[in-house]
UniProtKB/Swiss-Prot annotation:
This is Glutamate--tRNA ligase. Gene3D superfamilies: 1.10.10.350, HUPs. It is an enzyme of class 6 (ligase). Catalyzes the attachment of glutamate to tRNA(Glu) in a two-step reaction: glutamate is first activated by ATP to form Glu-AMP and then transferred to the acceptor end of tRNA(Glu). ATP binds at K253.
Length: 467
């Protein structure tokens, strides 16, 4: 049997960190076993779908390096890959369940359902149990009500059964059928509910293994019931633990202190392979505690048995460390492909070489680029106050000896060393006066590099009064 996994988002939002990790683990598992990874779009809830939601999901998966073997638009025997294109299939199978006695029409209105819930709460039953009243009506009454077209189709849960599975992450899990209410499989608008459509889709696409978030544990017994009703083979399930923030709380889309969506990290210029690597370690560890993996080595190393049963912690500092490490090892040409800087390619290369080791993300290059592209017109008060207390001799010598005709980093660096030897000074005593006079700031990259990047016109203008 070929391993087939899937990631099945709804286009109701953009790709979230948790969703990306789910997609990644399904992808790694499939590729480790030479299987297929499928992207399916669960768009049956039109009221919640957002414009470009599907496009965002696909583009951000591709940015991470999670490449589906099949997706919307693929022409295979397993499609279509959007739920909205399969409505007839769901409705046909729902009718089949009715004929087999596994489902039935229910004609309750909202007020009647509220009354049922209220009566059960009064009896101390706080988890709603649908009372199956509509199973007792005559065929004549049923046909009469069907003409009004206000009904849903409910799955008839076998209350005598236990619904169990050996979870790939958590081990044996069981739910008593008596604790599960008869649930809606087809809504009044004719659209399937999630728990019904997802089973049909997974069966149609021959999905063998499903890794998903722990919030789906309570959905699993309902889905197993559908598999059993059709006598279909049930896939293997694995439920991943939650991802928490630095305070140990579950990641929330309402938390404004941490980017929640992959799009945000992409736009900030995080290294995509670094994020891929970092994401894999949110709930999975290698046998030898290795942390750095390229794409192929991660696929080779991935073993679902090493998925954690404990919550994983999203550590932004760890992500920054990964991204910085990846960027520091990149060929300069590759970095330049991701940046739009000046028209001077020699300057661009020197600029990237200057900031490569200190940059966490591509946005850091742009931040530093602004310093040179839009240089300050004068020293601010704070810097001026520092500068006034310093010995100006290094600045005067530098201003009188710098060679503007042969603008060269090595010559600038040698001149600074020469001044230090002449005045018998080092460190801040040598560098800080020159740095403030030339760059108008007391910090930055190696001084000679900063001076070269600012360019001879700006430096000559700033040092004019010190000649």
């Amino acid at each position: 049997m070929k391993i087939r996994t899937r990631y099945a988002p709804s286009p109701t939002g953009f790709l979230h960190i948790g969703g990306a990790r789910t997609a990644l683990f399904n992808y790694l598992f499939a590729k480790h076993h030479n299987g297929d990874f499928i992207l399916r779009i669960e768009d049956s809830d039109n009221s919640r779908n957002i414009k470009d939601g599907e496009k965002s999901q696909i583009e951000n998966l591709l940015w991470l390096g999670i490449i589906p073997d099949e997706k919307p638009g693929s022409e295979t025997k397993f499609g279509p890959y959007r739920q909205s294109e399969k409505l007839e299939r769901y409705q046909k199978l729902a009718q089949e369940l009715i004929k087999k006695g596994f489902a039935y029409y229910a004609f309750d209105n909202q007020e009647e359902l509220k009354l049922q819930k209220k009566e059960q709460i009064a009896k101390g039953i706080f988890s709603f149990r649908y009372d199956q009243n509509w199973l007792k009506i005559s065929d004549q009454e049923k046909q009469k009500r069907l003409k009004n077209k206000h009904f849903v189709i409910r799955f008839k849960v076998d209350k005598a059964k236990n619904f169990c599975w050996n979870d790939l992450v958590r081990g044996q899990i069981c739910f008593e059928g008596s604790a599960i209410s008869d649930w809606v499989i087809i809504k009044s608008d004719g659209f399937p509910t999630y728990n019904f459509a997802v089973v049909v889709d997974d069966f149609d696409m021959e999905i063998s293994h499903i890794f998903r978030g722990e919030e789906h544990i309570s959905n699993t017994p309902k889905q197993i019931g559908i598999y059993q009703a059709f006598n279909w083979k049930t896939p293997k399930f694995g439920h991943l633990t939650i991802i928490t923030d630095k305070n140990g709380k579950k990641l929330s889309k309402r938390d404004k202190n941490l980017f929640q969506f992959i799009e945000d990290y992409k736009n900030q210029g995080y290294h995509s392979e670094a994020f891929f690597n970092f994401l894999a370690l949110l709930g999975w560890t290698s046998p030898d505690s290795q942390e750095f993996f390229d794409h192929k080595s991660l696929i080779k190393a991935f073993d679902y048995k090493r998925l954690s049963k404990a919550p994983s912690h999203f550590d932004i500092e760890k992500l920054n460390w990964f991204s910085k490490s990846y960027i520091s090892k990149m060929p300069v040409d590759k970095i330049l492909e991701n940046l739009e800087l000046s028209d001077n390619q020699i300057w661009n290369r020197f600029f990237v070489e200057t900031f490569q080791k200190s940059s966490i993300k591509y946005a850091d290059f742009y931040k530093n680029f602004e310093f040179f592209h839009r240089p300050k017109q004068e020293m601010d008060e704070k810097m001026l106050e520092i500068f006034e207390k310093l010995d100006k001799k290094p600045v005067k010598i530098f201003a009188s000896k710098i060679d503007y005709q042969n603008w060269d980093y090595t010559k600038i660096n040698d001149l600074i060393k020469e001044i230090g030897q002449k005045l018998e000074i080092t460190g801040k005593n040598l560098l800080l006066p020159i740095r403030l006079a030339t760059t108008f700031t007391n910090s930055g990259p190696e001084l000679a590099r900063a001076i070269w990047l600012l360019g001879k016109k700006i430096i000559e203008k700033r040092l004019l009064k010190w000649k």
